Amino acid sequence: MHLSEITHPNQLHGLSVRQLQQIARQIRDKHLQTVAVNGGHLGPGLGVVELTLGLYQTLDLDRDKVIWDVGHQAYPHKLLTGRYDRFHTLRQKDGVAGYLKLCENKFDHFGAGHASTSISAALGMALARDLKGEKFKAVAVIGDGALTGGMALEAINHAGHMPKTNLLVVLNDNDMSISRNVGAIPRYLNKMRLSQPVQFIKDNLEEQFKQIPFVGESLSPELGRIKEGMKRLAVPKVGAVFEELGFTYIGPVDGHNLEELITTFQQAHQIQGPVLVHVATVKGKGYEIAELDQVGYHAQSPFNVATGKAIPSNKPKPPAYAKVFSHTLVKLAEQNPKIVGITAAMATGTGLDKLQAKLPNQYVDVGIAEQHAITLAAGLATQGMRPVAAIYSTFLQRAYDQIIHDVCIQNLPVFFCLDRAGIVGSDGPTHQGMYDIAYLRCIPNIVIMAPKDEAELQRMVVTGVNHTSGPIAMRYPRGNGHGVPLMEEGWEPLEIGKSEILRTGDDVLIVAYGTMVYPGMQAAEILSEHGIEATVINARFVKPLDTELILPLAKKIGRVITLEEGCIMGGFGSAIAEALMDADILVPVKRFGVPDVLVDHAEPNESKTELGLTSHQIAERVLQAFFKQQVSAVV
């Protein structure tokens, strides 16, 4: 059977190990070739091919439910559940999503994009099953560092207290998250992986006994007791934590041995109560380049399969915002030993790996634990340190209570650096950084800013590090800057709450924030071609707003446009509208940003076009909103 013939995972039933191995090779090839063209997550999926095949051969997936944590390790799952023919559209607009979506496929039982949610979701399904008297298996596959997340441990704590609730947790242990795993739990799991020689000896006892002359066959009845004794000897050193928490622990199992995996899963399904199967895998398995560089090949832009090297663009690009942030922070940290960079398992993505390499004592990676990261930062701040928490906008949502309770209420000087703010592209709605303006600006004490370009980002990094009177946040986008000149040192901090006028005109006021400043300026030039002159303000700060500058201009000009790359509801435009209303300035305001919709996976420019946020679309919308009759008369 060829992979392309599989439209339902139950077609794996009855296939031999040799046939499954052939399917495994085809999955890896399709996975590799697709990601090489489209970009996407590479290492996680390559590492779970045999795990997926072995698990699915032992389940009835018309009935049983498998919940994949995070979702980036589920590419093999997608290839086995009727999406082979469309897999070439992976992460493209209207194509197969890079993560799991309930609406995409009936075998995607729970959406995912953030880590550590699978055990909670699977346990909820198991409880619903028991309450309704239904019969199906609930399985959570968790790994790639997600077990370091507090939510996963909370779910394990709860599940272990329910000995009559059947739940299978499959721990995909590849000793990695996105970067190398950190913390006591991964260290404990690593010790368990090192116990595999004991497991190997135990599994091969029968063959060894048979080779004993004269008495080998007669010893076979004793084999079960000897194996159980070895288990008792090994479990206190290996699976003791999970056993003490109420789980039956099985493992470690070789995650690339199909025969062993199938046997293990069959045994696990027979056990009453919560079971944890510990599967040891290799991230990037089957593609040697990815195996040797598991951090670099966690996810990839399009690359050459033969060399593993990224396909170069046609022209040089300016440095990425994350790179400029990293370079600036390292320079400042070299001068100020109180600066401490904090990441939640995203050292490479945020650029803090450069700080780790240069100043390891001023760097902390807490693992996938955003809540802990923020309260850790608060603790550092109480002792006069300058904590810089560099976290993707979408992941900071997970620490909202800590932002309010531990930082803002106590008015502690924590510097939040929100990478990937705004439209992020092909990762889809779970990763869009749409909500940070709205969820942060309602909190007292916090200052919030966003740079128009990479040079202004440098000044904002200095501003954030120097701001000691309370918390401050900076949001900045994924991708490359505008190519403006950068300084190596001597950056001047900005005055808190002060904006700048970039262009003057009497017909319309455009107040732009962050990444929308450049499109706002370009839209103003297009409007000028129609005889309409705009004043353009780079707001810089959404909190506090520069009301001294913005309000008089709004009153004088009488027409206001706000631009932001974030949700309109509660966002930057709402802040402007509220300020005008509070000052009794009754002028028309049009807010351009992301409406009350989820932005699906697509290239960022495709999403911006769909949302009407390109410079030409902004100009057209301004004309339609305020100058329709005037333009019609000219035409």
UniProtKB/Swiss-Prot annotation:
Protein residues bound to Mg(2+) = D144, N174
Give the highest taxon in the source lineage: Bacteria
Query: Which Gene Ontology terms describe the biological processes this protein takes part in?
Result: 1-deoxy-D-xylulose 5-phosphate biosynthetic process; isopentenyl diphosphate biosynthetic process, methylerythritol 4-phosphate pathway; terpenoid biosynthetic process; thiamine biosynthetic process
Can you quote the record's cofactor note?
Binds 1 Mg(2+) ion per subunit. Binds 1 thiamine pyrophosphate per subunit.
Question: Subunit structure, briefly?
Answer: Homodimer.
Give the UniProt family note: Belongs to the transketolase family. DXPS subfamily.
Q: What is this protein called?
A: 1-deoxy-D-xylulose-5-phosphate synthase
